[in-house]
Amino acid sequence: MFVDQTKIDVQAGKGGDGAVAFRHEKYVPLGGPAGGDGGRGGSIILVADSGLRTLMDFRFRRKFKADNGENGRIKSQYGRGAKDVRLKVPMGTSVYDFNTGELLGDLVENGQELVVAHGGKGGRGNIHFATPTRTAPEIAENGEPGEFRTLRLELKVLADVGLVGFPSVGKSTLLSVVTKAKPKIAAYEFTTLTPNLGMVVLPDGRDFSMADLPGLIEGASKGVGLGIQFLRHVERTKVILHLVSMDPNNGRDAYEDYETIRKELAGYTKDLTTKKEIIVATQMDIPGSEEKFAEFKKKLGDKTVYPISSVTHKGVSELMGKTADLVEEVAKEEAEKPAEIKVAEKEYVYKKPEDEGFKVERTGEHSFVVTGNKLERLVQRTNLDHTDGIMLLARKLKRLGVDEALRENGAVTGDDVSIADFTFEFVD
């Protein structure tokens, strides 16, 4: 089954907690702190694989979680970092943040990687908190939480040339003639339900990839028929071959069909109408097709149209030669200008939430909630199992102005104050 879009949840691993430990060895009377750092949590990484053609692997499994880093140990031993989880996706996969719609990256090259959820950093052990006046600190950091993301994966077929047109205009037949692809061909509409991909190799050694896309109908850009779910595949093509049937028995107006498909392409995105296009008049072997072709060509005006028959192969070689010329022309133009798509680097780094200060909110007669990215991260990273850690947190909150802000909002000694999942008693 061809699956070209899906939604997945990715949860990176939490960093290991730093340890509070001390040396207890003979002949080392002063000992000292010896708590090691926690290991980094595992990240979730998407990897483009040229051997995949669909997002089928994500149809039934949509939640992925990396392991947490190990906690720090005694004798200054660091915790082991967790292994990253690498998920293979087809080349041509676009990755979006499901909640914001932001394009995180396009995986268009084999082996290209995109880090979609970073593992949390390991917390520091108490060996890092010793000072001349604090020689035995019972202070350590908790590991950072791993990032969680809900992603939308969208596959856009990577092909140099896309075949578009109404159903039953001969797209699959043409693909089967010029490539080794074996698409399903039958005398009824919507025979092609998924994109088919093939490689065209010309006698002069030039080659290009070609995709047969499911037939479009009026309203496709608004979701009618197979519609919008396949229009996205046209986006990555360099050249569009617009096939129009010259069968005089189908009861259709060829020029109206051509204009309708052009409107649907524009309705999806204006970019599609700026792509290089070759108009192809198909099924020219059918009696009466010449008259219909003459009328069609007249209505097109000065636009060039290539008449072909995939049955007799008449005109096909000339068409493929012209197509190869256009593919090379577009490739040269693209090489001379900056890439317009956002390509994922080897590692994509999410922006840390901006520190927008903090906000104090009274939630009851004697209760307050303090919110703010920086404060919440500070509380999450502080090991509150030891008195030294709690006192260090209290000093940091005071320096950041939290105590003063609570007083200004009417807090008095004994009131409850909550930051993230930590609640403490305010002391003025």
Swiss-Prot record:
Q: Where does this protein hold Mg(2+)? A: S172, T192
Record-listed GTP binding positions = 165-172, 190-194, 212-215, 282-285, 309-311
Which HAMAP family does the record associate with it?
GTPase_Obg (MF_01454)
Q: Which family does it belong to?
A: Belongs to the TRAFAC class OBG-HflX-like GTPase superfamily. OBG GTPase family.
Domain OCT spans what residues? 350-428
Q: How does it assemble?
A: Monomer.
Where is the protein localized?
A: Cytoplasm
UniProt protein name: GTPase Obg
- One GO-annotated biological process of the protein: ribosome biogenesis
All copies of the OBG-type G domain together span 159-328
For molecular function, the Gene Ontology terms on record are: GTP binding; GTPase activity; magnesium ion binding
Enzyme class, spelled out? hydrolase
User: Keywords assigned by UniProt?
Assistant: Cytoplasm, GTP-binding, Hydrolase, Magnesium, Metal-binding, Nucleotide-binding
- Its GO CC terms? cytoplasm
This enzyme's EC code(s): 3.6.5.-
Chief location bin = cytoplasm
List each copy of the Obg domain by range.
Answer: 1-158
Which cofactor does this sequence's record say it needs?
Mg(2+)
What taxonomic ancestry is recorded?
Answer: Bacteria, Bacillati, Bacillota, Bacilli, Lactobacillales
Q: What does this protein do?
A: An essential GTPase which binds GTP, GDP and possibly (p)ppGpp with moderate affinity, with high nucleotide exchange rates and a fairly low GTP hydrolysis rate. Plays a role in control of the cell cycle, stress response, ribosome biogenesis and in those bacteria that undergo differentiation, in morphogenesis control.
